[in-house]
Amino acid sequence: AEAEGPFGLGREALPEEIAAWDIDIRPDGKGLPEGRGNVWDGEGVFVEQCAVCHGDFGEGVGRWPVLTGGFDTLTDQRPVKTTGSYWPYLSTVWDYVHRAMPFGNAQSLTDDEVYAITAYLLNMNGLVDGDFELSHENFSEVTLPNEDGFYMDDREELELPEFTRDPCMENCKESVEITMRAAVLDVTPDEAVQTM
Amino acid sequence: MTTSFKGTKPSRRQFLSGAAAAGAGTFVAAQARAAGDPAITELQPWTQQLGDGVDVAPYGMPSEYESHVKRRTVEWLTADPISSINFTPLHELDGIITPNGLCFERHHGGAAHIDPAEHRLMINGLVETPLVFTMQDLMRFPRENHVYFLECAANSGMEWRGSQLNGCQFTHGMIHNVMYTGIPLRLLLQEAGVKTEGKWILPEGADAAAMTRSIPMEKALDDCLVAFKMNGEALRTEQGYPVRLVVPGWEGNMWVKWLRRIEVGDKPWHHREETSKYTDLLADGKARRFTWEMDAKSVITNPSPQAPLTHGKGPTVLTGMAWSGRGTIPRVDVTTDGGITWHQARISGPSLDKSMHRFYYEFDWDGGPLYLQSRAHDSTGYVQPTKDQLREFRGVNSIYHNNGIQTWYVNEEGIAENVEIS
């Protein structure tokens, strides 16, 4: 049988080490550092640090992600899923911008800059006024429109019973017709499909 | 590639089609009849001259004739090649193990190059003692070896609206299957001492994406591994060197690479990769979250659009792979007529929990059109659904978790195409 320890390996993490790496934020505000930033300052930082990819108003440049708008499109043929139209929690915006943006220069923004950018994103999504200031104190008062748009995986109850049945083996259908062809779209890289 | 032709003479139509290998095969066959096969009757250079010394390739690469067997990307799928995807060449592989250099890549901040001497793994949060491990520390824990598939949640995601990409590399190649050597995550968590309120973990990467996902404690204590070897050697840079998380059967995004920290908490974190991404939008505008398991799935890898039939009619080997995030694959059915009649395929090789399985179906091709499909059954009794069955539950905008049955149409010339059928 495998030894189950404890093995006495590793050493205790120091408070300053934990502080350096434990930067995650939760929807209930756990992990938020003290700080504040307003829409006006957020626009300044956004234009300087973010707009080259995401556009001046979060509309996205080229193929880079759209951050704003898209309200009431989630049942459309082509939904536009943004922080405003789709994301459930503001904490995710703060956490993700702080840990991974700007793309190529991650974890370079100050806490106040992240508060300011988050406030500006709220404003661009039409969720707060231009004089709004976001801080660790009022953070949990902000709710995003699609907070209730998600529910726990229900495949087990909904799909699995339907797909756990003995399948047909013979005379399963009358005929077969092609209804769609990838070759018509012709978007596969050329050199990959060879006749050798 | 040259093949000498055996069996039934190809039709004039096949000859005129000019498919390279079929044409070459016919040519060789004709020559062989005339004066013997020059591959036999003429002395080949590799028979006469000496080969490479043992010092030529300290770390060997595949034969130069296999240079087409490689990862490929599709540029239009993502905004840039850093936060992007490439694809395993499934149509060129056999058995169940994916060679390390061909395992597909998915990065969000590029493949980080980490000096293992400078790498640390921290465990903090709701634990008795927050800990820091060096790689040297990790190498002193008991190890386990397991073969698991890692499938990107978005594998086949481009196909929700219909047939789009022509080749199983592109439609199904966000997957690999390797043997991991690693430490049961349970042992590392026990070392720190999880408090009773600790119900979730948050693994985090050391790369510029600092990838995080919330994983329930039950799974963390069950079969997750902190792995440092794949197929016997160190993890490849692009697979998380020096250490990654292994989350058997669950969507690839959760297998955090360049693992630097595991936090224990009492609630999920709802981070970007489990809210904005890796949530499955349904037709009613609501979305499923925490869709962790990868359902049973299969694909025929040969023949397929990148691997047409070039040998003419007669004995033909159909092969493919099947897998399930919920167990093993006791059975795979295949059809050559679009699902009118199904046959049980033959599974060859090990049948391991949450691992790929290799299946074969040998048949006599009459030269007529083929509508090929495979249908996996897993050890829970689940049978792989059609794409239409999935769309009834989910619509076409859920992006992730498309495990619908794939159809290849093979025409009289042996050319295969990604299609959907009635």
Mark where each language-model region is.
Chain B
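A generic secondary-structure boundary signal that marks alpha-helix termini
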Residues: A24-G25, V194
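N-terminal secretory signal peptides
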Residues: M1-Q14, A21, V28-A29
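Sec/Tat signal peptide C-region and signal peptidase I cleavage site
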Residues: Q31-R33
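Intrinsically disordered/low-complexity terminal segments and short unstructured peptides
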Residues: M1-T2, G7, G25, W46, ...
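Enrichment for repetitive, rod-forming helical segments
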Residues: A19-A20, E251
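Structured, non-membrane catalytic/scaffold regions adjacent to prosthetic-group chemistry
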Residues: A35-S422
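Intrinsically disordered, low-complexity segments enriched in polar/charged small residues
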Residues: S17-G18, L77
